[in-house]
Amino acid sequence: MAKELIFGHQNPDTDAIGTAIAYSYLQNKLGYDTEAVALGEANDETKYALNKFGFTAPRVIKTASNEVDAVMLVDHNEPQQSVSDIDKVKVTHVVDHHRIMNFNTADPLYYRAAPVGCTSTIMWQMYNEKEIEIPQDIAGIMLSAIISDTLLLKSPTTTDQDKEAVVSLANIAGVDYKEYGLKMLKAGTNIADKSEEDLIDLDAKSFELNGSNVRVAQINVVDLPEALERKDAFLKAMDEASKREGYDMFMLLITNILDSDSEALVVGSDESKAKFEKAFNAKLSDSEVKLPGVVSRKKQVVPPLTNAFEA
């Protein structure tokens, strides 16, 4: 059987990397020849989780077709979020928890998606269905992914399935998920030593919304006022990125993981800003607005933006 690469989206988070690792282990147990890789360097939170459970970060690839003919995707399906030459390889498997958009294939494939808080929750279910024992380290990295995506089960994306998976995986991994989870999340909130250009690209995704190219980035912090001291520099970096990459709108969501509130910074045309204000029923003031309780890009940001841009 020919080798396949497994990877998550660009600017990978803990779910993108952790689920790729877990899926590769599962598929290899089932007879496939796979390798988990990444479409970018691991962030500080992910590095903390990898180190905790004894993993080295997957190698980073820029293209896939120079290595393999087929790939498996986790935690994404939209082509603009995937490897740059996704159109040159065959996608044989997808495991995801996001909307399906601009995705089509020439051949049938395995596609597993569910509206849960994290792709690793689906992966946990797949291990159980296949009756494959989950090793301690794999359980730990899957647990880390769910904690990351659900903000320690506080995100509105959290489901009973996520909660059940966390309890089960924490037991296998041998950790107190609340204590470990808070340490892991805090490890990802150190922004002092990073440039604005790096921060707006660490956890960012592009979306095609009715012909508009919309970029949504998110950073997690424990001190929101301190982060907002860099507002002008953030806006400058966002504006430069928009001009360089052709974004019609760039939104940066700065989320306080301790109280689950966010502040949004927005750059773009007057038309796109008007659509943003319509989406959130909120008025921008000097390119900034408070978004209380908004922590999930997938559930609380992309759907209202989609509706506003398609209206």
Swiss-Prot record:
Q: Which residues bind Mn(2+) 1?
A: H9, D13, D75
| Cofactor binding, note field | Binds 2 manganese ions per subunit.
Question: Could you say which enzyme class this protein belongs to?
Answer: hydrolase
Residue numbers binding Mn(2+) 2? D15, D75, H97, D149
Q: Which GO terms describe its molecular function?
A: inorganic diphosphate phosphatase activity; manganese ion binding
Pfam annotation, one family: DHH
- The keyword Oxidoreductase is annotated on this UniProt entry: no
- Cofactor list: Mn(2+)
Subcellular location(s): the record lists: Cytoplasm
Q: Which UniProt keywords apply?
A: Cytoplasm, Hydrolase, Manganese, Metal-binding
* GO CC terms: cytoplasm
Protein origin, superkingdom: Bacteria
Show the catalytic activity. diphosphate + H2O = 2 phosphate + H(+)
InterPro entries per record: DDH_dom, DHH_sf, DHHA2, DHHA2_dom_sf, Mn-dep_inorganic_PyrPase
The cross-references to SMART domains, in alphabetical order and at most eight, read: DHHA2
As recorded in UniProt, its EC number(s) are 3.6.1.1
Q: Family per UniProt?
A: Belongs to the PPase class C family.
Task: Show the HAMAP family listed in the entry.
Answer: PPase_C
The record ties this protein, via NCBIfam families, to: PRK05427.1 (NF003877)
The protein's name = Probable manganese-dependent inorganic pyrophosphatase
Originating species: Lactobacillus johnsonii (strain CNCM I-12250 / La1 / NCC 533)
Q: Which gene name does the record give?
A: ppaC
